[in-house]
């Protein structure tokens, strides 16, 4: 403690100050009133169990009532360092059915609703007093090839990876099938993250893909594709099956429950798989440490797909330790370009959080 409003944080790991601060900005590092929480600690849990049902933070609102899986009532925190908000209270209700959420909104019983889905939002477009906001989320969908699959050597062929980038109908998926709930994004850092590449160099071009395959001497290409049997994953997979066929690539879908797909990927039993990614914290390393790092021990995305990348490992470790913020972002931009140029991933789209 430096003074009543300043603390000094030190760490032993060789990581940049930016990463440390970004991790501290996540919910796991929330600041709470020690004098209030400490007496309620049990079994060395630092008051964690008590905090599940009580409020002791410094944010704009504090929890007044919490009913798990039903509702939470928050009231303005007059002692917040930023001052009390204009709203005196906020009620957040869990309403599982999207149609019911839409009805509550239309009747004026709710001021805001989230996760309504494309059909419900379409029904609300243009209605008086209704505004739809779309905000980029960090959710990304991608196609991954298991380079360690012994049954299909095509999965480890860089020429096939390159061709695959030109066989995804990005616009058809995002604009038509997913109705604007996602947008095309083709790098491992999502839009909104510092250092994210927002360029989309790849388009649906089966003729170009055929040229790449022919030049590499690849004949009758085919692979199986593991996918969760629910939207948006199965929707994306069906589009890929159709668009890859136009490039002469046969794709056999293996739809299953999410737990089954996850188990097969963890066991390295897949050839191709449609997967979703969400970062753990707001820093480039959260994604780079999984897509561009494989130490052979941890279950990173690169590791799960058998991609051995000793040089990229070094680049990832160098980026996490770089103290200069501008230089650090440049390192991540170069890594994204490397993965766009050659990697067993095809980054397809990024999600939108739609609020009505």
Give residue spans per PLM region.
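Ligand-site clamp/hinge motif
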Residues: 49, 77-123, 241, 250
